[in-house]
Amino acid sequence: MEPGSDDFLPPPECPVFEPSWAEFRDPLGYIAKIRPIAEKSGICKIRPPADWQPPFAVEVDNFRFTPRIQRLNELEAQTRVKLNYLDQIAKFWEIQGSSLKIPNVERRILDLYSLSKIVVEEGGYEAICKDRRWARVAQRLNYPPGKNIGSLLRSHYERIVYPYEMYQSGANLVQCNTRPFDNEEKDKEYKPHSIPLRQSVQPSKFNSYGRRAKRLQPDPEPTEEDIEKNPELKKLQIYGAGPKMMGLGLMAKDKTLRKKDKEGPECPPTVVVKEELGGDVKVESTSPKTFLESKEELSHSPEPCTKMTMRLRRNHSNAQFIESYVCRMCSRGDEDDKLLLCDGCDDNYHIFCLLPPLPEIPKGVWRCPKCVMAECKRPPEAFGFEQATREYTLQSFGEMADSFKADYFNMPVHMVPTELVEKEFWRLVNSIEEDVTVEYGADIHSKEFGSGFPVSDSKRHLTPEEEEYATSGWNLNVMPVLEQSVLCHINADISGMKVPWLYVGMVFSAFCWHIEDHWSYSINYLHWGEPKTWYGVPSLAAEHLEEVMKKLTPELFDSQPDLLHQLVTLMNPNTLMSHGVPVVRTNQCAGEFVITFPRAYHSGFNQGYNFAEAVNFCTADWLPAGRQCIEHYRRLRRYCVFSHEELICKMAACPEKLDLNLAAAVHKEMFIMVQEERRLRKALLEKGITEAEREAFELLPDDERQCIKCKTTCFLSALACYDCPDGLVCLSHINDLCKCSSSRQYLRYRYTLDELPAMLHKLKVRAESFDTWANKVRVALEVEDGRKRSLEELRALESEARERRFPNSELLQQLKNCLSEAEACVSRALGLVSGQEAGPHRVAGLQMTLTELRAFLDQMNNLPCAMHQIGDVKGVLEQVEAYQAEAREALASLPSSPGLLQSLLERGRQLGVEVPEAQQLQRQVEQARWLDEVKRTLAPSARRGTLAVMRGLLVAGASVAPSPAVDKAQAELQELLTIAERWEEKAHLCLEARQKHPPATLEAIIREAENIPVHLPNIQALKEALAKARAWIADVDEIQNGDHYPCLDDLEGLVAVGRDLPVGLEELRQLELQVLTAHSWREKASKTFLKKNSCYTLLEVLCPCADAGSDSTKRSRWMEKELGLYKSDTELLGLSAQDLRDPGSVIVAFKEGEQKEKEGILQLRRTNSAKPSPLASSSTASSTTSICVCGQVLAGAGALQCDLCQDWFHGRCVSVPRLLSSPRPNPTSSPLLAWWEWDTKFLCPLCMRSRRPRLETILALLVALQRLPVRLPEGEALQCLTERAISWQGRARQALASEDVTALLGRLAELRQRLQAEPRPEEPPNYPAAPASDPLREGSGKDMPKVQGLLENGDSVTSPEKVAPEEGSGKRDLELLSSLLPQLTGPVLELPEATRAPLEELMMEGDLLEVTLDENHSIWQLLQAGQPPDLERIRTLLELEKAERHGSRARGRALERRRRRKVDRGGEGDDPAREELEPKRVRSSGPEAEEVQEEEELEEETGGEGPPAPIPTTGSPSTQENQNGLEPAEGTTSGPSAPFSTLTPRLHLPCPQQPPQQQL
């Protein structure tokens, strides 16, 4: 069976060791410890502790190397034998003029080597044919039976192998035509192996890696192209019988061949024997035939296609040539036309003298049988690795390696299993079909390129961490030169042995079976990268492995006996194991060590891109193996790396520097070496060589002191000759020096035979010094002579072991333990004596007991050393025993005096030793102290003790010595504690109970608990709570009986305090109800005034705006309203908390705030009026540019100016008035072109801070406030606001009732009536100048015209507060208004400056009020009519109205689609019908929608109560009787005079008396 044909079976794993940190600190010691186990496997793996991670010290950027080229199937021994065999056959057929083609049988290449070998084993070709055993041959080649494969193999053997085997056996065969054999499978051409040729040509580039065999591609044949082109070569063409031979050089250059080989495409695995002559007939050989048959076949041989002429004869004038011009067979020179000249040796043969004879002169190059045989039997050249031509960095090599592996396995490199790589590797090395080539950066000198470990040198500064690893024994630069290592005594830096080598690997790169130089140890560390797979064989099986490899591949070892020392040969571990060789394996991962032991064969390969470092080291146990290795090298005639004798002598010269174990091993080796040297020099004397001279061999180069016979490096002695000065031999080969006489030969020696024993003696003294010392120690420890040594003598022995570096033996450990124990005893004895001197101040817990003292004395007596402290310890023991007797006597005579017991106890403490009786004395003393403490605690005159003290006494009483007095005291304590805990629990329940008890109940509990003589915390807390409750009741009585109603803050504080008290208070419920009612009123007032998500508090809205003049303050407040930074009541009114309780102070502060607000708004109006209009300004911000509340600069159309502060805002950012609807409750129709009545008035959100409810709504809040027995700041502010509004209303009515204003209002009324009479609103009339005396016939309500007044067909539209306008009508209304804008003219009134100024001032003051008044709208209409219509504002309002209506329609359609989807899905969620019924105005977005929604919410919340009857105003039925609508009917009361007069007493001020025209 072909080795490796089956799947690879991994060998067992080698031992793996994981040392602890303590073991890891001594590398060679740990290796010696594990050697008995690991040596049995040959290799082992060591995993360092997890924290040991040396940094990678190689300079990556400067690291450049040239790798070796490895062809995998040339590494394996058996595969190389096959390849060499195929090369020989190929060479044979190539000489014959044909190229080898290997046939395919059963879809695999026929193994010609195995076929030839099996044929020989079965008895040869003739025997197999005779016995018809070709089927057995097929079976042994693992071919399936029953397919007539035997016959197929026979034909292949006959035509390919048999002619070569016959030539090898010496038969004379010439080229003959054989019958062609038509095979069903295509043969495959074989490319000759030619290892020497490959080593001399340029290597292929790495981008041409191929998985299939390049050797199986067509080999470029010797071409005739060069011959045809070169006329000189054309003249040298030789014609004659026989095939051409390669020796003439008529072929393409190697460079051309290599180029074709690289550039040629991959071909399927085929092998052929190709006819080189260019003919159609294949030149094949069959079994030998008779001469006549061969002659007959040759006569029918076709002529070759190559045109050739007869060979030119040589110059006949050459006599020597004429003499040699005879046939070598018959020695005749006649019939020269039948004479053939060999192209190889120039011998002549008659064509009829050859066997078989040739019918005619063959054309082309012809070789005689002798030359063919010589060429085929030429020995192969030694195999070795060739170097690549490309230089790599680590990065470029890694990229190449990873790319190769990923492409080969078709997966990422980290995902390829190690088992798969291992099987594929051994498959490739066993394959002759596939030729995979890899590169391996092996044996890179760390001295030149730098080590992977940190190195302590002057090249660069090391960090503390690097310094630690640079000195570590596991650093491969340090390990070979450790003190216990042999190699530290070699001065030279031996690369690979003392100086580490570096290895940069890629997948499949391998190191072959080998052992280390001089059979030394080796250690390999994998710095990083993918694993490295190792195989190892123990040293006991080393010779067996060599025998197996020689047996399986004798062809290799015949030509290279030291093949295994060349690191170029692999053999499948399964093959070795099948022949009984024990093999182990391991995968070395990054950060792990692999150690190989002496003469342990090992090999392996890399799983991928990695970086490793290796070095050799030798320990004392290696010395015998090193000596045996020299003898082995002598037999193989292999060069030594260093002289073993020199190493031994150098160590023997300085024995004191040697480790003791090493000295013993060196002594043993030195003794053997001296005995051998005596024997060899004696043999010289017997031969008669007496001349000698001293030679310092260590000063000579190694190549000048090598034995010319065995290549051993000489040191102790060598034999030289005066007449042959160029060579010398070791004393083992004295007969191989030269043929000169012995008298001319002389001995060259390093030491005399007298000097060697002296060196040996020094080694013996060093080795035996340990035995002498050990004997002294043994006598001292065992006191064999009856004399105890002093402590100083034992210390001297230990110091001697340390100074002479004795090994850490068991005896040394016993000595150290003895010294340690003795020193501890001395220290303890000194402490005992010093403790007595310290007396009671000695440290507690360090005293020894009496038993320990006696044991300590016995321990000191048993130690093998004398100590004078023993006497002191004996004295202490006597004192303690005397004290013990006295204490026993005192305890026996109880009851004794407590003072006597205490003094006796103090004396015992001074001894420094614990006596058992001392504990009894201590307990008696503690009992007396406890009884005294109980008496003091229970005494009537004593301070009441706490529960914790009583519990502590009970606990302490349980530990004192029992007695009747103790039992009685414990019973009294327990009874008192039980009663106290019961009352304490009752008080706790009163404090924690949800149902609070009245003060009377708590007083009763406290009175009863006062009789208990114990401090009770809960009772005390109950007392304090009761006192606080009484104080709280007093505060309530005081605040309720004051001059004014209590403030809400005071009530809230009392309620908070009362709720925290654990006492039931009747007044608390009443206060809580008052506070709740006040909060309810405040909430209702907030909903009435405050907008949704308002940034103002209710009090801020009701009070005058203190910062009305600061635009930036108002804006920042508006933009940062989410921060909730509201001012307190005192900040708003500028009053202290005490002043807020005085109503008079509140009113005065409110009045002052009104004045500040008015002054501030005037200043703000002047500032804002000075700003440029955004309708004409640019978008660039400046110090005078208006900025909207959104923070953006105002520019272009769409901006509105506030009628109060005169500042500008984006229409989309604020609430704007609506032209097509009126929010008034009683609207009246107005003509379409009465533009002055359109609702175009705009107040910004900074000026209009609240909802501005009507006065009747405020009066309802005041009526509810009147019923509250609580004062609120908001209530008083609301009263002040109401007074301010009524005051302004009176002044406004007075102004409207003047003659000038009444006339102007009359003209407006007349003009409105005239416009109502117009038939077509599309054709507005030209307005005449309004007469100055037209009276005002209608009321001055603010109500703007309804939408139906604007429609051409008079359709009515419901108010938008309830139902959204219809889509069509609203659109037509907007279009109508837009078309009427060009027709608006004005002003329609002429207002004199004397009339306009007061009205404008009244208008400004009215806009400052957070109350809605009809007079305000009347004044605004009058001022509007006195100026031209603001067409720009009207257009802006129309555009905003259109945009809002468009958004409402879109939201309505989206809502309908969402409702339908929910209906289709049947899903749950919000009721779509409810959403549909909601006003679209409410669901719209923007500030206007929010205000409408807030108004509707307020109406729903206040709908139950409702405001009182509206106050009659101008235009209402109650005032229509009066022309000016200002004076009430005689004897009637109008306005809020009566309600206000009832509210005023809450402020404790008289109701203001107003003139009749100012009252409502």
From Swiss-Prot:
Cofactor(s) this protein cannot do without: Fe(2+)
Q: What class of enzyme is it?
A: oxidoreductase
Domain named ARID is located at 79-169
Q: What is the effect of changing L731F?
A: In MRXSCJ; impairs enzymatic activity
Q: Does the keyword Zinc apply?
A: yes
Q: Which sequence positions carry the modification called Phosphoserine? A: S287, S301, S317, S893, S897, S1359
Q: Which reaction does it catalyse?
A: N(6),N(6),N(6)-trimethyl-L-lysyl(4)-[histone H3] + 3 2-oxoglutarate + 3 O2 = L-lysyl(4)-[histone H3] + 3 formaldehyde + 3 succinate + 3 CO2
UniProt feature, compositional bias: Basic and acidic residues: 1335-1345, 1464-1481
Q: Where in the cell is it found?
A: Nucleus
Q: Does this entry carry the keyword DNA repair?
A: no
Binding positions for Fe cation? H514, E516, H602
- Sites where the protein binds 2-oxoglutarate: Y440, S522, N524, K532
Which parts of this chain are annotated as the region Disordered? 197-227, 1161-1181, 1316-1371, 1444-1560
Record text on subunit structure and interactions:
Part of two distinct complexes, one containing E2F6, and the other containing REST. Interacts with ZMYND8.
Q: Which PANTHER family match?
A: LYSINE-SPECIFIC DEMETHYLASE, LYSINE-SPECIFIC DEMETHYLASE 5C
The entry's family comment says: Belongs to the JARID1 histone demethylase family.
UniProt name for this protein: Lysine-specific demethylase 5C
Originating organism: Homo sapiens (Human)
Question: Which lineage?
Answer: Eukaryota, Metazoa, Chordata, Craniata, Vertebrata
